[in-house]
Swiss-Prot record:
Biological-process GO terms, alphabetical: 'de novo' CTP biosynthetic process; pyrimidine nucleobase biosynthetic process
Any Gene Ontology CC annotation: cytosol
Taxonomic lineage: Bacteria, Pseudomonadati, Pseudomonadota, Gammaproteobacteria, Aeromonadales
Catalytic center residues: 379 (nucleophile), 515, 517
Pfam families: CTP_synth_N, GATase
Chain sites annotated for binding UTP: 14, 187-192, 223
Uppermost EC category: ligase
Additional notes on this entry: CTPSs have evolved a hybrid strategy for distinguishing between UTP and CTP. The overlapping regions of the product feedback inhibitory and substrate sites recognize a common feature in both compounds, the triphosphate moiety. To differentiate isosteric substrate and product pyrimidine rings, an additional pocket far from the expected kinase/ligase catalytic site, specifically recognizes the cytosine and ribose portions of the product inhibitor.
Notes on how activity is controlled: Allosterically activated by GTP, when glutamine is the substrate; GTP has no effect on the reaction when ammonia is the substrate. The allosteric effector GTP functions by stabilizing the protein conformation that binds the tetrahedral intermediate(s) formed during glutamine hydrolysis. Inhibited by the product CTP, via allosteric rather than competitive inhibition.
Name of the protein: CTP synthase
Keywords of the record: ATP-binding, Glutamine amidotransferase, Ligase, Magnesium, Metal-binding, Nucleotide-binding, Pyrimidine biosynthesis
Length: 545
């Protein structure tokens, strides 16, 4: 079957939730038995978001094949079963980089390189490659219609719709329909102007998703349909909801999936949303609440830890517990003291980079260890747990990571000096290597030790988890740390690198080098987070009694 394309654009303002709306539609189409994939086209000049500040951009989502991508790909994987790859996200910078490399190589035979056709052709080629082998490809264009940065992408999808035939392409536009309290009504003019902007570049939207804080009345939807030249049934009201996992059912109730199926002439059954109904039921009916302290350096923007936040909530669903995440700036532990950790049922230290706030994270790991509070360390969260244990239990005073202190007497964590690149070649890295694309990335095999907590949680002796780091546990200092009581319970495929450590003298103290949050979904959860939240619930009950 010819792949059908749904191009998703946004207008009026940014942060309307294009990614979640697109992923929700994908979930309903998948529930109808269609093979669906999603792509995100980002208009910034960075080659990828790998070196961008999480406070500016939010989290970097890592795919199975090791691509550093936009956090929207995390939404895609949480809503549909299809796994994303480096083909599912690309930026203006990546496209220009490819085109310029071809120009230097002489591929264009002396032609003048222009946005049209060279850049737009490169965009179209990447979209087609990413969509290959699927019934439906939903392609989200980052940014807002009217932004200068988005123009090459919008021109490329306009051309692509012509190339593949309009019966194989559909344009879905998200807009804001604000409510003015003074007038006591919603206003449609911003939507009309946004569509006018889209029309000026040759794109007539087929479906309008109208975002608002309330349901949009039928008469206003009719008005939008009239002025924006779309059928009334193609004006979808998407009001604010208390859970993003309600959106698939909300879109289905307005017939959006049927509209798409009819437009493309697809033969498929009705959508079965039973799994999503179960998620919503679990979310609405918790039996208790636990407070998780997330100790990090990017806590001013919770989206910097988007997948961790969601993974905790997924584990809450499985344990029938409501999750209250208390964001704690790790520097506050250094300046305000340990009282900021009072009242927590568990402590989580997520990944991060740079020296700022590291001592606060080490204090959090020490507090959790000494007070028997459930602890989950992720990536840097494992490294600080190791440093803390080395300093205060193993007698290695001044132990640190060479990332933060070059002259530490005990570099218990050190730089990966040799790694395998995307093409399978050995790459030597030093302190002076580029920051972009020089990490251990993607899904890696991990061996679990028999009798360990993680072996019981996963129910398997090998697992696959995703990595994003350039520093590893220093094996030469490991025997002394293990002799003091910390146990290595997970090892890399070649059994040379430490992936998981546990403290057997603690009710629940697990720290991992990988990022388990990237594989957690609302329907399936993740065993590590489920075990962590279960331990938090047990800790909460013990202290209530």
């Amino acid at each position: 079957m010819t792949t059908k394309y749904i191009f998703v654009t946004g207008g009026v303002v940014s942060s309307l939730g294009k990614g979640i709306a697109a992923a929700s539609l994908a979930a309903v189409l998948e529930a109808r038995g269609l093979k669906v994939t999603m792509l995100k086209l980002d208009p910034y000049i960075n080659v990828d978001p790998g070196t961008m500040s999480p406070i500016q951009h939010g989290e970097v989502f890592v795919t199975e094949d090791g691509a550093e991508t936009d956090l929207d790909l995390g939404h895609y994987e949480r809503f549909i079963r299809t796994k994303m790859s480096r083909r599912n996200n690309f930026t203006t910078g990546r496209v220009y980089s490819d085109v310029l490399r071809k120009e230097r190589r002489g591929d264009y035979l002396g032609a003048t390189i222009q946005v049209i056709p060279h850049i737009t052709n490169a965009i179209k080629e990447r979209v087609i490659a990413g969509a290959e082998g699927h019934d439906v490809a939903i392609v989200e264009i980052g940014g807002t219609v009217g932004d200068i940065e988005s123009l090459p992408f919008l021109e490329a999808i306009r051309q692509l719709a012509v190339d593949i035939g309009r019966n194989n392409a559909l344009f879905m536009h998200l807009t804001l329909v604000p409510y003015l309290a003074a007038a006591g009504e919603v206003k449609t003019k911003p939507t009309q102007h946004s569509v006018k902007e889209l029309l000026s570049i040759g794109i007539q939207p087929d479906i309008l998703i109208c975002r608002s804080d309330r349901a949009i009345p039928a008469n206003e939807r009719a008005k939008i349909a009239l002025f924006c030249n779309v059928p009334e049934r193609a004006v979808i009201s998407l009001k604010d909801v208390d859970s993003i996992y309600k959106i698939p059912a909300l879109l289905k109730s307005q017939g959006l999936d049927q509209l798409v199926v009819d437009r493309f002439g697809l033969q498929c059954g009705e959508a079965n949303l039973a799994e999503w109904e179960q998620v919503i039921y679990q979310e609405a009916n918790p039996t208790g609440e636990v407070t998780i302290g997330m100790v990090g350096k990017y806590v001013s923007l919770p989206d910097a830890y988007k997948s961790v936040n969601e993974a905790l909530k997924h584990a809450g669903l499985k344990n029938r517990l409501s999750i209250n995440i208390r964001y704690i700036d790790s520097q506050d532990l250094e300046t305000k003291g340990l009282e900021v950790l009072d009242g927590l049922d568990a402590i989580l230290v997520p990944g991060g980079f740079g020296e700022r706030g590291v001592e606060g994270k080490i204090l959090a790991a020490q507090y959790a260890r000494e007070n028997k509070i459930p602890y989950l360390g992720i990536c840097l969260g494992m490294q600080v747990a190791l440093i803390e244990f080395a300093r205060h239990v193993a007698g290695m005073d001044g132990a640190h990571s060479s990332e933060f202190k070059r002259d530490t007497p005990y570099p218990v964590v050190g730089l990966i000096t040799e790694w395998i690149d995307e093409e399978g070649k050995v790459e030597v890295r030093t302190e002076g290597s580029d920051l972009g694309g020089t990490m251990r990335l993607g899904s890696q095999l991990c061996h679990l030790v028999e009798g360990s907590k993680v072996r019981a949680l996963y129910g398997s002796d090998t697992i696959q988890e995703r990595h994003r780091h350039r520093y590893e546990v220093n094996n030469t200092l490991l025997p002394k740390i293990e002799a003091a009581g910390l146990k290595v319970t997970g090892l890399s495929a070649d059994k040379k690198l430490v992936e998981i450590v546990e403290n057997p003298d603690h009710p629940w103290f697990v720290a991992v080098q990988f990022h388990p949050e990237f594989t957690s979904t609302p329907r399936d959860g993740h065993p590590l987070f489920e075990g962590f939240i279960q331990a938090a619930g047990e800790y909460m009950k013990r202290h209530l009694n």
